[in-house]
A protein has these predicted regions:
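Transmembrane-helix motifs of polytopic, lipid-linked glycan transferases
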Residues: 54, 58, 169-193
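Membrane-interface alpha helices of multi-pass inner-membrane proteins
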Residues: 249-263, 274-275, 294-299
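Membrane-proximal lumenal/periplasmic loop motifs of glycosylation machinery
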Residues: 105-113, 124-178, 218
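Short acidic/glycine- and proline-prone juxtamembrane loop motifs at membrane-interface regions
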Residues: 114, 214-224, 262
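Membrane-proximal stem/loop segments at transmembrane-domain junctions that anchor or position
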Residues: 311-435
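Specific aromatic-rich, kink-prone transmembrane helix
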Residues: 124, 187, 224-242, 256, ...
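Membrane-interface anchor segments at the N-terminal boundary of transmembrane helices
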Residues: 165-169, 404-488
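Start-transfer (signal-anchor) and selected internal transmembrane alpha helices
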Residues: 1-28, 36-101, 529-535
Length: 535
């Protein structure tokens, strides 16, 4: 009797698929409730999580069952002509370009943060050492490739004699690149024959997205990085699901090189994506191996001799181990178990008293940027640091787990408030409005997250993308599930790097790629299909 009820409840889903729904539901429940351990205690949180898991699993099973039934219906391919694709591309580009330009002219010369100021200072040759920057001159702390792009524009516009104009022109070019990439992505799905409703919905998401509008004219490497990630995701989709192999080697190489050099974790994102693609698609292994080898060689050349020849200082090792550094600092702050040998090593990195007083659960920056923090010692003793961190783990497991939760929960706890935008321009000056209607989408985004923190937080965005991919994959056949995984691998790898070295909790710019990818995850996961239903 019970078995029949369970079978009826599961519908078209197999046992493994039902189990997967429960696993996903349990992970979601703990993501919601784990940060509340300090308020309610383990038993109450466990009870709440059981209830939430059952409800979530039931909803997932019902949704997945419906999607699986829909996916059984055959569809007739209906690709559109090249003329229709060009028209769609031009219309999308024109609308996005005008929208972004309105934001730029209303907030001239565009938005800048502390990181942007550091980049401009390097370009102008006035970068000085500080506890925040910790470099004097050119440095790869902010990817030197992005700094180089800014430098090129500054050199080309130097005869104007205006720093603001140079910034404005650079951000105009950045927003144009963003508009081109987004319009190309829309045009791909137009070409593949997706319905007008989906195309219009995806376009509307881009056009009326306040975070995208703000970021397009903000001097952050995350904007171009996220656009490149989206380009790679959509190109992988057109390759793996629709067999579009034309120029795949070149486009894959360009996208991977840009991702590698636009952000410090880009190499890991590219490596993980190429590895999974190599394993899952035997027919593409030669091209993938060639691209991987080229990217690896370029990375070694740039990070080694090229940076040395240019006199560019490498990024500090501490930037790559933010979470382990936080866990050690939390142990010191809370009086955890530390033996004499461990204490001696920690004191060489930063005196324990200073570490105890500087610890901030939400970011390792007060530790890394302390005036007594010895970056040089840490650079020379990387292995010893990792050994010390690992040796402290067994005796301080609870503290380590809590420190990890506090530092990363912005990327997995739905509703955790995120830092979204910056509203100032260079050196914290107020931007100028040349249009007269004071349009700053960043303020709108901030008001939205203040009023509705759940749908506008980093954690919620990530879970939304994960849920769409999950429910879509349940309805796909085995081969297509693997291909879906390849397509979203840049997002998975990006998130994984934040779980190891998040610079701050819940910083939306770090996961901006998820925002851009959200409407395109629907067809990738098979939730929206090309063509029309077969009569």
């Amino acid at each position: 009797m019970i078995g029949k009820l369970m079978k009826d409840w599961a519908g078209n889903l197999k046992r493994g698929e039902v189990c997967a729904c429960f696993v996903f539901a349990v992970l979601f429940a703990w993501a919601v409730l784990l940060p509340e351990l300090g308020k309610f205690g383990l038993k109450q949180v466990a009870l709440f999580s059981i209830g939430l898991s059952i409800v979530s699993a039931s909803v997932l099973v019902a949704i997945c069952d419906q999607i699986k039934q829909i996916n059984r219906k055959e569809r007739v391919a209906a690709r559109r002509s090249s003329k229709q694709v060009r028209i769609a591309f031009l219309l999308c580009f024109a609308a996005l370009e005008v929208s972004f330009l309105a934001v730029l002219l209303s907030n001239w010369p565009g938005f800048c943060s502390t990181d942007s100021n550091d980049i401009v200072n390097q370009v102008l040759g006035v970068s000085e050492w500080s506890t925040w920057h910790r470099y004097d001159g050119l440095a790869n702390h902010h990817p030197i490739f992005y700094t180089f792009l800014v430098w090129v524009v500054f050199q080309a516009t130097a005869f104007f004699g205006s720093i603001d104009l140079s910034i404005g022109i650079f951000l105009f070019l950045q927003m144009t690149v963003a508009a081109l990439v987004l319009s190309w992505c829309i045009s791909v799905f137009v070409r593949l024959g997706f319905g007008k409703r989906y195309i219009l919905a995806a376009f509307a998401f881009m056009l009326f997205n306040p975070i995208l509008a703000n970021y397009s004219v903000t001097m952050w490497k995350d904007v171009l990085f996220s656009c490149c990630a989206l380009f790679l995701i959509v190109r992988l989709y057109s390759l793996l699901f629709h067999g579009e192999k034309k120029h795949i080697g070149r486009t894959l190489l360009v996208a991977c090189l840009l991702l590698t050099f636009l952000r410090s974790n880009g190499f890991m994102v590219v490596g993980a994506t190429l590895l999974v693609l190599f394993v899952i698609e035997p027919d593409l292994r030669k091209k993938v191996a060639a691209v991987g080898a080229a990217v690896f060689c370029a990375f070694l050349v740039v990070q080694g001799p090229l940076l040395s020849i240019m006199g560019v200082q490498k990024g500090h090792f501490s930037e790559s181990v933010g979470i382990p550094l936080q866990q050690i600092a939390a142990t010191v702050h809370k009086g955890g178990h530390i033996n004499e040998e461990q204490e001696e090593f920690i004191n060489r990195v930063l005196p324990m008293e200073a570490m105890r007083d500087s610890y901030n659960p939400q970011t390792p920056n007060p530790i890394k940027f302390h005036e007594s923090f010895d970056d040089a010692f840490l650079e020379e003793h990387k292995i010893e640091f990792l050994v010390t961190w690992a040796s402290m783990l067994p005796s301080n497991l609870g503290i380590y787990v809590k420190a990890w939760i506090d530092e990363t929960q912005g990327y997995w706890n739905p509703g955790y408030p995120s830092w979204l935008v910056t509203n100032s321009t260079l050196y914290e000056q107020a931007p100028r409005d040349y249009l007269g209607f004071d349009w700053d989408p960043g303020f709108l985004a901030q008001k939205l997250i203040a009023a509705l923190p759940v749908p506008f937080s980093s954690g919620t965005l990530i879970w939304a993308v994960a849920a769409l991919v999950f429910v879509g994959c349940v309805g796909l056949e085995k081969k297509k599930r693997a291909r879906c995984l390849v397509c979203v691998m840049p997002l998975i790898a990006l998130l994984a790097t934040l779980f190891v070295a998040a610079p701050a909790v819940g910083d939306y710019s770090y996961i901006f790629a998820f925002n851009l990818a959200l409407p395109f995850v629907l067809p990738i996961a098979g939730l929206v299909k090309a063509g029309r239903p077969k009569a």
